[in-house]
Protein backbone atom coordinates (compact mmCIF):
# COMPACT_ATOMS: atom_id res chain seq x y z
CA UNK A 1 0.00 0.00 0.00
CA UNK A 2 1.21 3.50 -0.83
CA UNK A 3 0.03 6.79 0.62
CA UNK A 4 -0.28 9.55 -1.95
CA UNK A 5 -1.94 12.92 -2.45
CA UNK A 6 -2.80 12.17 -6.10
CA UNK A 7 -3.86 9.17 -8.15
CA UNK A 8 -4.23 8.91 -11.92
CA UNK A 9 -7.06 6.40 -11.60
CA UNK A 10 -9.69 5.79 -8.95
CA UNK A 11 -10.78 2.35 -7.73
CA UNK A 12 -12.56 0.09 -10.24
CA UNK A 13 -16.06 0.89 -9.00
CA UNK A 14 -15.50 4.48 -10.23
CA UNK A 15 -14.98 2.98 -13.69
CA UNK A 16 -18.29 1.14 -13.34
CA UNK A 17 -19.89 4.45 -12.35
CA UNK A 18 -18.53 6.05 -15.52
CA UNK A 19 -20.29 3.40 -17.61
CA UNK A 20 -23.59 3.69 -15.72
CA UNK A 21 -23.52 7.50 -15.73
CA UNK A 22 -22.94 7.65 -19.46
CA UNK A 23 -25.92 5.39 -20.19
CA UNK A 24 -29.68 5.90 -19.93
CA UNK A 25 -32.07 3.44 -18.31
CA UNK A 26 -29.35 1.68 -16.32
CA UNK A 27 -29.02 1.86 -12.53
CA UNK A 28 -26.07 0.91 -10.34
CA UNK A 29 -26.64 -0.30 -6.78
CA UNK A 30 -23.35 -0.03 -4.93
CA UNK A 31 -22.68 -1.68 -1.57
CA UNK A 32 -20.53 1.03 -0.03
CA UNK A 33 -19.98 2.95 3.21
CA UNK A 34 -20.94 6.59 3.68
CA UNK A 35 -17.50 7.90 2.68
CA UNK A 36 -17.61 6.39 -0.83
CA UNK A 37 -20.40 8.71 -1.96
CA UNK A 38 -17.68 11.27 -2.82
CA UNK A 39 -17.64 9.84 -6.35
CA UNK A 40 -20.80 11.76 -7.24
CA UNK A 41 -18.77 14.97 -7.23
CA UNK A 42 -16.59 13.70 -10.07
CA UNK A 43 -19.57 13.94 -12.40
CA UNK A 44 -21.56 16.87 -11.01
CA UNK A 45 -18.65 19.17 -10.17
CA UNK A 46 -15.80 18.24 -12.54
CA UNK A 47 -17.78 17.12 -15.60
CA UNK A 48 -20.56 19.60 -14.74
CA UNK A 49 -23.41 17.19 -15.43
CA UNK A 50 -26.82 18.58 -14.59
CA UNK A 51 -27.99 15.49 -12.73
CA UNK A 52 -26.59 12.99 -10.27
CA UNK A 53 -25.16 9.68 -11.45
CA UNK A 54 -27.70 6.81 -11.51
CA UNK A 55 -26.13 5.20 -8.46
CA UNK A 56 -27.74 4.10 -5.20
CA UNK A 57 -25.38 3.57 -2.27
CA UNK A 58 -26.22 1.37 0.69
CA UNK A 59 -24.19 3.84 2.82
CA UNK A 60 -23.66 1.52 5.75
CA UNK A 61 -21.93 3.00 8.78
CA UNK A 62 -19.80 1.51 11.55
CA UNK A 63 -22.87 0.87 13.71
CA UNK A 64 -24.36 -1.31 10.93
CA UNK A 65 -21.49 -3.78 10.94
CA UNK A 66 -22.92 -5.56 13.97
CA UNK A 67 -26.20 -6.12 12.13
CA UNK A 68 -27.25 -7.75 8.85
CA UNK A 69 -25.61 -5.64 6.14
CA UNK A 70 -26.99 -8.02 3.50
CA UNK A 71 -30.51 -6.94 4.39
CA UNK A 72 -29.38 -3.32 4.12
CA UNK A 73 -28.24 -3.99 0.54
CA UNK A 74 -31.47 -5.76 -0.40
CA UNK A 75 -33.55 -2.88 0.96
CA UNK A 76 -31.49 -0.38 -1.06
CA UNK A 77 -31.92 -2.47 -4.23
CA UNK A 78 -35.70 -2.73 -3.76
CA UNK A 79 -36.00 1.00 -3.18
CA UNK A 80 -33.85 1.80 -6.22
CA UNK A 81 -35.95 -0.38 -8.51
CA UNK A 82 -39.22 1.03 -7.19
CA UNK A 83 -38.05 4.64 -7.53
CA UNK A 84 -36.13 4.64 -10.83
CA UNK A 85 -37.75 1.76 -12.78
CA UNK A 86 -34.58 1.05 -14.81
CA UNK A 87 -34.41 -1.16 -17.90
CA UNK A 88 -31.47 -3.03 -16.33
CA UNK A 89 -29.51 -2.95 -13.09
CA UNK A 90 -25.88 -3.57 -12.24
CA UNK A 91 -24.82 -4.36 -8.69
CA UNK A 92 -21.47 -4.48 -6.98
CA UNK A 93 -19.38 -3.35 -4.04
CA UNK A 94 -16.91 -0.55 -3.56
CA UNK A 95 -13.36 -1.23 -2.41
CA UNK A 96 -14.43 -0.94 1.24
CA UNK A 97 -17.75 -2.71 0.71
CA UNK A 98 -16.02 -5.74 -0.81
CA UNK A 99 -14.37 -6.48 2.53
CA UNK A 100 -17.75 -7.45 4.01
CA UNK A 101 -18.23 -10.17 1.36
CA UNK A 102 -22.02 -9.89 1.19
CA UNK A 103 -22.29 -11.09 -2.47
CA UNK A 104 -24.35 -8.24 -3.98
CA UNK A 105 -24.94 -10.21 -7.19
CA UNK A 106 -26.52 -13.17 -5.47
CA UNK A 107 -28.57 -10.98 -3.17
CA UNK A 108 -29.95 -8.87 -6.03
CA UNK A 109 -30.90 -11.89 -8.15
CA UNK A 110 -32.75 -13.39 -5.20
CA UNK A 111 -35.09 -10.39 -5.26
CA UNK A 112 -36.59 -11.54 -8.57
CA UNK A 113 -36.67 -8.23 -10.43
CA UNK A 114 -38.31 -8.48 -13.90
CA UNK A 115 -35.27 -6.84 -15.53
CA UNK A 116 -31.71 -8.00 -16.24
CA UNK A 117 -29.56 -7.79 -13.10
CA UNK A 118 -25.83 -7.97 -13.86
CA UNK A 119 -23.34 -8.58 -11.08
CA UNK A 120 -20.09 -6.64 -11.50
CA UNK A 121 -17.35 -8.31 -9.47
CA UNK A 122 -14.38 -5.94 -9.47
CA UNK A 123 -11.12 -6.81 -7.64
CA UNK A 124 -10.81 -3.50 -5.83
CA UNK A 125 -7.26 -3.90 -4.56
CA UNK A 126 -5.67 -5.35 -7.72
CA UNK A 127 -7.22 -3.24 -10.49
CA UNK A 128 -8.12 0.39 -11.13
CA UNK A 129 -10.64 2.68 -12.80
CA UNK A 130 -10.12 2.05 -16.52
CA UNK A 131 -10.03 -1.70 -16.00
CA UNK A 132 -13.24 -1.43 -13.97
CA UNK A 133 -14.91 0.51 -16.78
CA UNK A 134 -13.76 -2.02 -19.40
CA UNK A 135 -14.92 -4.99 -17.31
CA UNK A 136 -18.30 -3.38 -16.60
CA UNK A 137 -18.90 -2.62 -20.28
CA UNK A 138 -17.84 -6.13 -21.25
CA UNK A 139 -20.22 -7.72 -18.74
CA UNK A 140 -23.07 -5.50 -19.95
CA UNK A 141 -22.43 -6.44 -23.58
CA UNK A 142 -22.28 -10.14 -22.75
CA UNK A 143 -25.44 -10.06 -20.66
CA UNK A 144 -27.56 -7.85 -22.92
CA UNK A 145 -26.32 -8.67 -26.45
CA UNK A 146 -25.49 -12.31 -25.73
CA UNK A 147 -29.08 -13.62 -26.02
CA UNK A 148 -29.19 -12.34 -29.63
CA UNK A 149 -25.96 -14.07 -30.65
CA UNK A 150 -26.08 -16.40 -33.67
CA UNK A 151 -25.62 -20.12 -33.15
CA UNK A 152 -21.97 -21.26 -33.05
CA UNK A 153 -20.61 -21.87 -36.54
CA UNK A 154 -23.19 -19.63 -38.21
CA UNK A 155 -21.70 -17.35 -40.85
CA UNK A 156 -22.53 -13.67 -40.78
CA UNK A 157 -25.04 -12.88 -43.57
CA UNK A 158 -23.98 -10.53 -46.34
CA UNK A 159 -25.33 -6.99 -46.30
CA UNK A 160 -28.29 -6.55 -48.64
CA UNK A 161 -27.67 -4.63 -51.86
CA UNK A 162 -28.38 -0.91 -51.61
CA UNK A 163 -28.18 -0.87 -47.80
CA UNK A 164 -25.61 1.52 -46.33
CA UNK A 165 -22.96 -0.10 -44.13
CA UNK A 166 -23.28 0.53 -40.40
CA UNK A 167 -21.02 0.38 -37.39
CA UNK A 168 -21.05 0.82 -33.62
CA UNK A 169 -18.92 3.43 -31.84
CA UNK A 170 -17.55 1.79 -28.72
CA UNK A 171 -15.76 3.26 -25.72
CA UNK A 172 -16.99 6.79 -24.86
CA UNK A 173 -17.96 7.17 -21.21
CA UNK A 174 -18.86 9.80 -18.67
CA UNK A 175 -15.84 11.70 -17.33
CA UNK A 176 -13.84 10.91 -20.48
CA UNK A 177 -11.47 13.40 -22.07
CA UNK A 178 -13.48 15.13 -24.85
CA UNK A 179 -15.55 11.97 -25.44
CA UNK A 180 -18.74 13.98 -26.09
CA UNK A 181 -17.16 15.97 -28.92
CA UNK A 182 -15.26 12.99 -30.32
CA UNK A 183 -18.59 11.20 -30.82
CA UNK A 184 -19.92 14.13 -32.85
CA UNK A 185 -16.74 14.38 -34.93
CA UNK A 186 -16.46 10.67 -35.78
CA UNK A 187 -20.19 10.33 -36.45
CA UNK A 188 -19.92 13.20 -38.94
CA UNK A 189 -16.80 11.72 -40.54
CA UNK A 190 -18.46 8.33 -41.00
CA UNK A 191 -21.60 9.98 -42.36
CA UNK A 192 -19.54 11.71 -45.07
CA UNK A 193 -18.10 8.31 -45.97
CA UNK A 194 -21.60 6.85 -46.33
CA UNK A 195 -21.46 4.77 -43.13
CA UNK A 196 -24.32 4.85 -40.62
CA UNK A 197 -23.82 4.63 -36.86
CA UNK A 198 -25.95 1.86 -35.38
CA UNK A 199 -25.21 2.41 -31.66
CA UNK A 200 -22.87 4.61 -29.65
CA UNK A 201 -22.04 2.80 -26.42
CA UNK A 202 -21.82 3.13 -23.53
CA UNK A 203 -22.33 6.92 -23.62
CA UNK A 204 -25.87 7.82 -24.64
CA UNK A 205 -27.06 4.24 -25.06
CA UNK A 206 -29.76 2.27 -23.25
CA UNK A 207 -29.74 -1.43 -22.33
CA UNK A 208 -32.01 -1.99 -25.35
CA UNK A 209 -29.38 -0.36 -27.57
CA UNK A 210 -26.67 -2.63 -26.15
CA UNK A 211 -28.85 -5.62 -27.05
CA UNK A 212 -28.73 -4.68 -30.76
CA UNK A 213 -24.98 -4.15 -31.08
CA UNK A 214 -24.85 -7.27 -33.24
CA UNK A 215 -26.87 -5.57 -36.00
CA UNK A 216 -23.89 -3.49 -37.17
CA UNK A 217 -21.39 -4.61 -39.81
CA UNK A 218 -18.33 -3.72 -37.75
CA UNK A 219 -17.22 -1.85 -34.63
CA UNK A 220 -15.16 1.31 -34.26
CA UNK A 221 -13.10 1.12 -31.07
CA UNK A 222 -12.64 4.74 -30.09
CA UNK A 223 -10.93 4.10 -26.76
CA UNK A 224 -9.24 0.67 -26.46
CA UNK A 225 -8.83 1.00 -22.67
CA UNK A 226 -12.62 0.90 -22.34
CA UNK A 227 -13.90 -1.01 -25.38
CA UNK A 228 -11.11 -3.36 -26.41
CA UNK A 229 -12.35 -6.34 -24.40
CA UNK A 230 -15.99 -5.94 -25.47
CA UNK A 231 -15.00 -5.52 -29.14
CA UNK A 232 -12.96 -8.73 -29.02
CA UNK A 233 -15.97 -10.60 -27.63
CA UNK A 234 -18.28 -9.19 -30.32
CA UNK A 235 -15.76 -10.22 -32.97
CA UNK A 236 -15.64 -13.74 -31.58
CA UNK A 237 -19.40 -14.21 -31.08
CA UNK A 238 -20.99 -11.99 -33.77
CA UNK A 239 -18.08 -12.12 -36.27
CA UNK A 240 -17.90 -8.31 -36.30
CA UNK A 241 -14.45 -6.97 -37.21
CA UNK A 242 -13.26 -3.89 -35.34
CA UNK A 243 -10.87 -1.04 -36.02
CA UNK A 244 -7.36 -0.87 -34.59
CA UNK A 245 -6.55 2.76 -35.50
CA UNK A 246 -7.52 5.59 -33.16
CA UNK A 247 -8.14 8.70 -35.33
CA UNK A 248 -6.23 11.29 -33.29
CA UNK A 249 -4.08 13.45 -35.58
CA UNK A 250 -4.15 13.97 -39.34
CA UNK A 251 -2.08 10.90 -40.26
CA UNK A 252 -4.03 8.64 -37.91
CA UNK A 253 -7.35 9.99 -39.22
CA UNK A 254 -6.31 9.22 -42.80
CA UNK A 255 -5.27 5.71 -41.73
CA UNK A 256 -8.61 5.35 -39.94
CA UNK A 257 -10.52 6.36 -43.08
CA UNK A 258 -8.70 3.72 -45.10
CA UNK A 259 -9.39 1.10 -42.41
CA UNK A 260 -13.14 1.75 -42.05
CA UNK A 261 -13.69 2.02 -45.81
CA UNK A 262 -11.96 -1.34 -46.25
CA UNK A 263 -14.30 -2.85 -43.64
CA UNK A 264 -17.33 -1.20 -45.26
CA UNK A 265 -16.28 -1.96 -48.84
CA UNK A 266 -16.32 1.65 -50.11
CA UNK A 267 -13.82 3.96 -51.82
CA UNK A 268 -11.83 6.22 -49.45
CA UNK A 269 -10.31 8.45 -52.16
CA UNK A 270 -12.94 11.24 -52.21
CA UNK A 271 -12.75 11.73 -48.45
CA UNK A 272 -8.96 11.60 -48.35
CA UNK A 273 -8.74 14.25 -51.06
CA UNK A 274 -11.23 16.49 -49.25
CA UNK A 275 -9.55 16.36 -45.83
CA UNK A 276 -9.96 19.77 -44.23
CA UNK A 277 -7.50 19.97 -41.35
CA UNK A 278 -5.33 23.09 -41.19
CA UNK A 279 -2.65 21.38 -39.09
CA UNK A 280 -0.43 20.18 -42.00
CA UNK A 281 -0.22 23.61 -43.64
CA UNK A 282 0.13 25.50 -40.36
CA UNK A 283 2.93 23.23 -39.16
CA UNK A 284 4.78 23.53 -42.51
CA UNK A 285 4.44 27.29 -42.81
CA UNK A 286 7.43 29.55 -42.17
CA UNK A 287 5.80 30.89 -39.00
CA UNK A 288 6.05 27.41 -37.48
CA UNK A 289 9.77 26.79 -38.01
CA UNK A 290 10.28 27.52 -34.31
CA UNK A 291 8.43 24.26 -33.55
CA UNK A 292 11.14 22.12 -35.13
CA UNK A 293 12.98 19.92 -32.63
CA UNK A 294 11.20 21.35 -29.60
CA UNK A 295 11.78 18.83 -26.82
CA UNK A 296 8.46 17.36 -25.64
CA UNK A 297 7.60 15.02 -22.76
CA UNK A 298 4.33 13.05 -23.06
CA UNK A 299 2.38 11.24 -20.33
CA UNK A 300 -1.26 10.09 -20.13
CA UNK A 301 -3.47 7.11 -20.82
CA UNK A 302 -1.95 4.81 -23.43
CA UNK A 303 -4.32 5.76 -26.27
CA UNK A 304 -3.75 9.50 -26.02
CA UNK A 305 -0.05 9.28 -25.15
CA UNK A 306 0.82 7.08 -28.14
CA UNK A 307 -1.29 9.24 -30.47
CA UNK A 308 0.29 12.42 -29.11
CA UNK A 309 3.78 11.06 -29.70
CA UNK A 310 2.98 10.38 -33.36
CA UNK A 311 1.52 13.86 -33.86
CA UNK A 312 4.43 15.53 -32.09
CA UNK A 313 7.06 13.68 -34.08
CA UNK A 314 5.51 13.32 -37.55
CA UNK A 315 3.17 16.29 -37.85
CA UNK A 316 4.69 19.09 -35.77
CA UNK A 317 8.40 18.25 -35.96
CA UNK A 318 8.89 18.04 -32.19
CA UNK A 319 11.51 15.78 -30.66
CA UNK A 320 9.94 13.28 -28.26
CA UNK A 321 12.32 13.01 -25.30
CA UNK A 322 9.97 11.18 -22.94
CA UNK A 323 6.90 8.96 -23.30
CA UNK A 324 4.93 7.37 -20.50
CA UNK A 325 1.57 6.16 -19.28
CA UNK A 326 -0.23 5.07 -16.15
CA UNK A 327 -2.07 2.37 -18.17
CA UNK A 328 -0.16 -0.74 -17.12
CA UNK A 329 -2.53 -2.97 -19.13
CA UNK A 330 -1.17 -1.32 -22.30
CA UNK A 331 2.48 -1.51 -21.37
CA UNK A 332 3.39 -3.56 -24.45
CA UNK A 333 1.89 -1.02 -26.86
CA UNK A 334 3.62 1.84 -25.06
CA UNK A 335 7.01 0.11 -25.15
CA UNK A 336 6.66 -0.48 -28.89
CA UNK A 337 5.84 3.20 -29.39
CA UNK A 338 8.79 4.29 -27.24
CA UNK A 339 11.16 2.27 -29.44
CA UNK A 340 10.11 4.31 -32.48
CA UNK A 341 11.29 7.49 -30.77
CA UNK A 342 14.34 5.93 -29.13
CA UNK A 343 13.22 6.82 -25.60
CA UNK A 344 12.85 4.84 -22.40
CA UNK A 345 9.14 4.23 -21.65
CA UNK A 346 7.87 5.38 -18.27
CA UNK A 347 5.03 3.15 -17.04
CA UNK A 348 3.99 4.24 -13.58
CA UNK A 349 1.10 5.58 -11.55
CA UNK A 350 3.38 7.50 -9.18
CA UNK A 351 3.29 11.20 -10.04
CA UNK A 352 6.55 11.77 -8.16
CA UNK A 353 8.36 9.52 -10.65
CA UNK A 354 6.83 11.52 -13.48
CA UNK A 355 7.95 14.80 -11.92
CA UNK A 356 11.49 13.50 -11.44
CA UNK A 357 11.61 12.39 -15.08
CA UNK A 358 10.39 15.77 -16.34
CA UNK A 359 13.00 17.56 -14.22
CA UNK A 360 15.71 15.22 -15.56
CA UNK A 361 14.81 15.58 -19.25
CA UNK A 362 14.32 19.37 -19.30
CA UNK A 363 11.62 19.41 -22.00
CA UNK A 364 10.36 22.59 -23.62
CA UNK A 365 6.75 21.35 -23.58
CA UNK A 366 4.91 18.85 -21.39
CA UNK A 367 1.82 17.05 -22.72
CA UNK A 368 -0.04 15.21 -19.99
CA UNK A 369 -2.88 15.04 -17.50
CA UNK A 370 -4.01 17.49 -14.85
CA UNK A 371 -1.09 16.38 -12.65
CA UNK A 372 1.45 17.10 -15.39
CA UNK A 373 -0.05 20.57 -15.62
CA UNK A 374 0.82 21.07 -11.93
CA UNK A 375 4.28 19.54 -12.39
CA UNK A 376 5.05 21.74 -15.40
CA UNK A 377 3.88 24.84 -13.55
CA UNK A 378 6.21 24.08 -10.64
CA UNK A 379 9.12 23.54 -13.02
CA UNK A 380 8.32 26.54 -15.20
CA UNK A 381 7.69 24.51 -18.38
CA UNK A 382 4.82 25.13 -20.86
CA UNK A 383 2.13 22.44 -20.73
CA UNK A 384 -1.00 21.25 -22.55
CA UNK A 385 -3.49 18.63 -21.33
CA UNK A 386 -4.01 15.64 -23.63
CA UNK A 387 -5.54 12.94 -21.43
CA UNK A 388 -7.74 12.16 -18.45
CA UNK A 389 -7.69 12.64 -15.51
CA UNK A 390 -8.51 16.29 -16.04
CA UNK A 391 -10.09 19.10 -14.08
CA UNK A 392 -13.16 21.20 -14.78
CA UNK A 393 -11.50 23.52 -17.33
CA UNK A 394 -10.94 20.57 -19.68
CA UNK A 395 -14.68 20.00 -20.06
CA UNK A 396 -15.17 23.13 -22.19
CA UNK A 397 -18.50 24.60 -23.23
CA UNK A 398 -17.22 24.93 -26.81
CA UNK A 399 -16.83 22.17 -29.39
CA UNK A 400 -13.31 20.83 -28.89
CA UNK A 401 -12.79 17.25 -30.13
CA UNK A 402 -9.48 15.42 -30.21
CA UNK A 403 -10.40 13.00 -33.01
CA UNK A 404 -10.78 13.57 -36.72
CA UNK A 405 -9.63 16.51 -38.82
CA UNK A 406 -11.24 19.11 -36.60
CA UNK A 407 -9.62 17.42 -33.61
CA UNK A 408 -6.25 17.92 -35.30
CA UNK A 409 -6.99 21.65 -35.58
CA UNK A 410 -7.86 21.78 -31.88
CA UNK A 411 -4.68 19.89 -30.99
CA UNK A 412 -2.49 22.27 -33.01
CA UNK A 413 -3.92 25.30 -31.23
CA UNK A 414 -3.81 23.68 -27.79
CA UNK A 415 -0.21 22.52 -28.05
CA UNK A 416 1.28 25.55 -29.77
CA UNK A 417 -0.29 28.33 -27.72
CA UNK A 418 1.73 27.64 -24.53
CA UNK A 419 5.00 27.90 -26.46
CA UNK A 420 7.03 31.03 -27.09
CA UNK A 421 6.82 31.87 -30.78
CA UNK A 422 10.03 32.09 -32.79
CA UNK A 423 9.66 35.82 -33.50
CA UNK A 424 8.94 36.48 -29.83
CA UNK A 425 12.08 34.58 -28.85
CA UNK A 426 14.19 36.55 -31.35
CA UNK A 427 12.83 39.87 -30.09
CA UNK A 428 13.65 38.94 -26.51
CA UNK A 429 17.18 38.03 -27.58
CA UNK A 430 17.60 41.28 -29.51
CA UNK A 431 16.34 43.55 -26.73
CA UNK A 432 17.47 41.67 -23.60
CA UNK A 433 20.18 44.29 -22.92
CA UNK A 434 17.94 47.28 -23.68
CA UNK A 435 17.65 49.73 -20.77
CA UNK A 436 13.85 49.45 -20.83
CA UNK A 437 13.25 45.80 -21.69
CA UNK A 438 16.03 43.99 -19.82
CA UNK A 439 15.11 41.43 -17.14
CA UNK A 440 16.00 43.72 -14.23
CA UNK A 441 13.88 46.66 -15.38
CA UNK A 442 10.59 47.44 -13.69
CA UNK A 443 7.46 47.57 -15.88
CA UNK A 444 7.16 51.02 -17.45
CA UNK A 445 3.70 51.61 -16.01
CA UNK A 446 5.05 51.19 -12.46
CA UNK A 447 7.43 54.12 -12.61
CA UNK A 448 11.20 54.36 -12.80
CA UNK A 449 12.14 51.96 -10.02
CA UNK A 450 15.11 49.63 -10.41
CA UNK A 451 15.54 46.02 -9.37
CA UNK A 452 17.78 45.44 -6.36
CA UNK A 453 21.33 44.26 -7.10
CA UNK A 454 21.88 40.53 -6.71
CA UNK A 455 24.20 40.89 -3.73
CA UNK A 456 21.70 43.11 -1.88
CA UNK A 457 18.87 40.68 -2.60
CA UNK A 458 20.89 37.80 -1.16
CA UNK A 459 21.92 39.72 1.94
CA UNK A 460 18.45 41.10 2.68
CA UNK A 461 16.87 37.92 4.15
CA UNK A 462 19.70 37.50 6.65
CA UNK A 463 19.47 41.15 7.73
CA UNK A 464 15.72 40.85 8.14
CA UNK A 465 16.10 37.71 10.25
CA UNK A 466 18.74 39.39 12.42
CA UNK A 467 16.57 42.47 13.00
CA UNK A 468 13.56 40.37 13.89
CA UNK A 469 15.63 38.20 16.24
CA UNK A 470 16.89 41.22 18.20
CA UNK A 471 13.34 42.55 18.48
CA UNK A 472 11.81 39.26 19.60
CA UNK A 473 14.65 37.77 21.60
CA UNK A 474 15.36 34.76 19.40
CA UNK A 475 18.51 32.86 20.32
CA UNK A 476 21.81 33.94 18.72
CA UNK A 477 22.42 30.60 16.93
CA UNK A 478 19.32 31.28 14.78
CA UNK A 479 20.83 34.59 13.64
CA UNK A 480 24.16 32.95 12.91
CA UNK A 481 22.42 30.18 11.00
CA UNK A 482 20.47 32.60 8.81
CA UNK A 483 23.61 34.64 8.14
CA UNK A 484 25.55 31.51 7.24
CA UNK A 485 22.88 30.47 4.73
CA UNK A 486 22.97 33.93 3.13
CA UNK A 487 26.76 33.90 3.02
CA UNK A 488 26.76 30.44 1.44
CA UNK A 489 24.74 31.67 -1.54
CA UNK A 490 27.20 32.68 -4.25
CA UNK A 491 26.82 36.12 -5.86
CA UNK A 492 26.84 36.44 -9.65
CA UNK A 493 29.28 38.94 -11.10
CA UNK A 494 27.72 41.21 -13.77
CA UNK A 495 29.90 39.78 -16.55
CA UNK A 496 28.89 36.24 -15.53
CA UNK A 497 25.20 37.19 -15.61
CA UNK A 498 25.73 38.62 -19.09
CA UNK A 499 27.45 35.42 -20.24
CA UNK A 500 24.63 33.34 -18.75
CA UNK A 501 22.10 35.22 -20.90
CA UNK A 502 23.82 33.83 -24.02
CA UNK A 503 22.69 30.33 -23.08
CA UNK A 504 19.34 29.31 -24.69
CA UNK A 505 16.46 30.11 -22.36
CA UNK A 506 15.16 26.54 -22.12
CA UNK A 507 18.41 25.29 -20.50
CA UNK A 508 19.42 28.55 -18.83
CA UNK A 509 17.77 27.56 -15.56
CA UNK A 510 19.68 24.29 -15.44
CA UNK A 511 22.96 26.08 -16.20
CA UNK A 512 22.31 28.57 -13.38
CA UNK A 513 21.48 25.82 -10.88
CA UNK A 514 24.51 23.73 -11.82
CA UNK A 515 26.86 26.72 -11.60
CA UNK A 516 25.53 27.77 -8.19
CA UNK A 517 25.84 24.20 -6.95
CA UNK A 518 29.43 24.03 -8.24
CA UNK A 519 30.27 27.36 -6.57
CA UNK A 520 28.81 26.30 -3.22
CA UNK A 521 30.60 22.95 -3.28
CA UNK A 522 33.93 24.63 -4.04
CA UNK A 523 33.56 27.60 -1.70
CA UNK A 524 33.37 30.21 -4.46
CA UNK A 525 31.77 33.41 -3.12
CA UNK A 526 31.47 35.29 -6.43
CA UNK A 527 30.58 33.55 -9.67
CA UNK A 528 32.65 34.85 -12.57
CA UNK A 529 32.75 33.90 -16.24
CA UNK A 530 35.58 31.48 -15.39
CA UNK A 531 33.40 29.84 -12.71
CA UNK A 532 30.59 29.43 -15.22
CA UNK A 533 32.84 27.58 -17.67
CA UNK A 534 34.52 25.56 -14.92
CA UNK A 535 31.06 24.39 -13.83
CA UNK A 536 30.18 23.52 -17.41
CA UNK A 537 33.33 21.41 -17.74
CA UNK A 538 32.69 19.77 -14.37
CA UNK A 539 29.15 18.63 -15.19
CA UNK A 540 30.07 17.60 -18.74
CA UNK A 541 32.36 14.84 -17.50
From Swiss-Prot:
Entry's cofactor comment: Binds 1 [4Fe-4S] cluster per heterodimer. The cluster is bound at the heterodimer interface by residues from both subunits.
Active site (record annotation): 287
GO molecular function: 4 iron, 4 sulfur cluster binding; ATP binding; metal ion binding; oxidoreductase activity, acting on iron-sulfur proteins as donors; oxidoreductase activity, acting on the CH-CH group of donors, iron-sulfur protein as acceptor
Pathway(s) the chain acts in: Porphyrin-containing compound metabolism; bacteriochlorophyll biosynthesis (light-independent)
Pfam families in the cross-refs: Oxidored_nitro, PCP_red
Keyword line: 4Fe-4S, ATP-binding, Bacteriochlorophyll biosynthesis, Chlorophyll biosynthesis, Iron, Iron-sulfur, Metal-binding, Nucleotide-binding, Oxidoreductase, Photosynthesis
InterPro entries (UniProt xref): ChlB/BchB/BchZ (IPR050152), LI-POR_suB-like_C (IPR013580), Nase/OxRdtase_comp1 (IPR000510), P-CP_red_C (IPR042298), Protochl_reductB (IPR005969), Protochlorophyllide_Rdtase (IPR016209)
Cofactor: [4Fe-4S] cluster
Listed SUPFAM superfamilies: Helical backbone' metal receptor
Residues holding [4Fe-4S] cluster: 36
E.C. designation(s): 1.3.7.7
Substrates-to-products reaction catalysed: chlorophyllide a + oxidized 2[4Fe-4S]-[ferredoxin] + 2 ADP + 2 phosphate = protochlorophyllide a + reduced 2[4Fe-4S]-[ferredoxin] + 2 ATP + 2 H2O
Chain positions recorded as substrate binding sites: 422-423
Quaternary structure, from the entry: Protochlorophyllide reductase is composed of three subunits; BchL, BchN and BchB. Forms a heterotetramer of two BchB and two BchN subunits.
Family to which this protein belongs: Belongs to the ChlB/BchB/BchZ family.
HAMAP family to which the protein is assigned, alphabetical: ChlB_BchB
Described purpose of this protein according to its UniProt entry: Component of the dark-operative protochlorophyllide reductase (DPOR) that uses Mg-ATP and reduced ferredoxin to reduce ring D of protochlorophyllide (Pchlide) to form chlorophyllide a (Chlide). This reaction is light-independent. The NB-protein (BchN-BchB) is the catalytic component of the complex.
This protein's name: Light-independent protochlorophyllide reductase subunit B
The species this protein was found in: Rhodopseudomonas palustris (strain HaA2)
Amino acid sequence: MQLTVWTYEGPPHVGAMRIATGMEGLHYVLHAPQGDTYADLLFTMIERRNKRPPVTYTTFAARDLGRDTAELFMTAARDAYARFQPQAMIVGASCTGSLIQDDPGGLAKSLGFPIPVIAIDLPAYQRKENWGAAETFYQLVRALAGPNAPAPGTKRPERAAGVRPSCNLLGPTALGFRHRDDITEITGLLGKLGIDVNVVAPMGSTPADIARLGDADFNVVMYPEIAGQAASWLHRIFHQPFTKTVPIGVSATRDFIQEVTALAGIDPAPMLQASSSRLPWYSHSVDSTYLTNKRVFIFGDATHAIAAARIASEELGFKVVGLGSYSREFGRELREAAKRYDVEPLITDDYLEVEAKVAELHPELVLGTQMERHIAKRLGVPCAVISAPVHVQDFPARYAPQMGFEGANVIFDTWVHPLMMGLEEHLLTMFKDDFEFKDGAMPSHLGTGHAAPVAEAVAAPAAAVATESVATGVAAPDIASATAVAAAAAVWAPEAEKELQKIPFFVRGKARRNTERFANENGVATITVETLYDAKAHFAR
